[in-house]
Amino acid sequence: MKAIYDLPAPAKLNLFLHITGRREDGYHLLQSVFMLIDWCDTLHVELRSDGQLSREDLTTELPPDDLVLRAARALQAHAAPGQGAHIGIAKQVPAQAGMGGGSSDAATCLLALNRLWGLDLPLSRLAEIGVQLGADVPFFLGGRNAWVEGIGEKIRPVDIPSARFVVAKPPQGLDTKLIFSAPDLQRATPVAIISGFAADSEQLEAPNPESSAFKVFDFGHNDLQPVAQRLCPAVTDAIEWLGAQGLKARMTGSGSSVFAKMPQGPQEAELAKAPPGWQVRQCSNLAVHPLWGWAT
């Protein structure tokens, strides 16, 4: 195999994000549901026989040593001498959005190079490599929507009803470290239980699926959102812009993107014109990652 093209790296939304405590080492304890959506970056990998790693930015210019190159370098330690790769990245998922774009790119890179180089490393080993790159990388490697706990290391797959969403990303970004270090961050939300999320098979087969879907997508809140709104008023602007169209929005991750579930109906809904510089997209959620099963 000399190349693999058109490899998707899907973004995620946090349906809720609770901070339930803080460890002595400073890491925050969280609970969240990570949901894959069809807003994707695209990677292309080509085999190099000189042992070199190179990257080509096909859309947005990326930092010289981004997560993709770091992922490739970490995996290359398991490759045969002389195995290298040229990696092309077409970015579509915005940065500083709370959508996991960089982590998803790293996960897709690991899955792709594991196959390109014929390494056949198991998913558990890839996850060990991935967690050193970022806490969200193992989720994307796992390939399923998930209930996430601890500092992000406890991942349990969950089923989520199919739904459509509108995601709005204002041009301003947010520094995750600033949010987590804020003195007014809520760090004591009571621990929830997965059954309270109501995303089990019995709920999915309920007579009124819209009712059960509402429970799933309206569960909990995002503890990071009040701090983010204080630091970045554009988050509030985005929530209010969606609210003016009858959509109940909340922030994903540490922002600055916000999202809202769309009512059942046509594939594409008519939305008001977004302010200049905003990225707005209507998305569907995914049951599994497009590369699910590439490592087991």
From Swiss-Prot:
GO molecular function, one term: ATP binding
Binding locations of ATP: 94-104
Keywords, sorted A to Z: ATP-binding, Isoprene biosynthesis, Kinase, Nucleotide-binding, Transferase
Pfam families according to UniProt: GHMP_kinases_C, GHMP_kinases_N
EC number: 2.7.1.148
Annotated pathway: Isoprenoid biosynthesis; isopentenyl diphosphate biosynthesis via DXP pathway; isopentenyl diphosphate from 1-deoxy-D-xylulose 5-phosphate: step 3/6
GO biological process, one term: terpenoid biosynthetic process
Enzyme class: transferase
Family statement drawn from the similarity comment of this UniProt entry: Belongs to the GHMP kinase family. IspE subfamily.
NCBIfam families registered for this protein in UniProt: ispE
Protein name: 4-diphosphocytidyl-2-C-methyl-D-erythritol kinase
Species, as recorded: Variovorax paradoxus (strain S110)
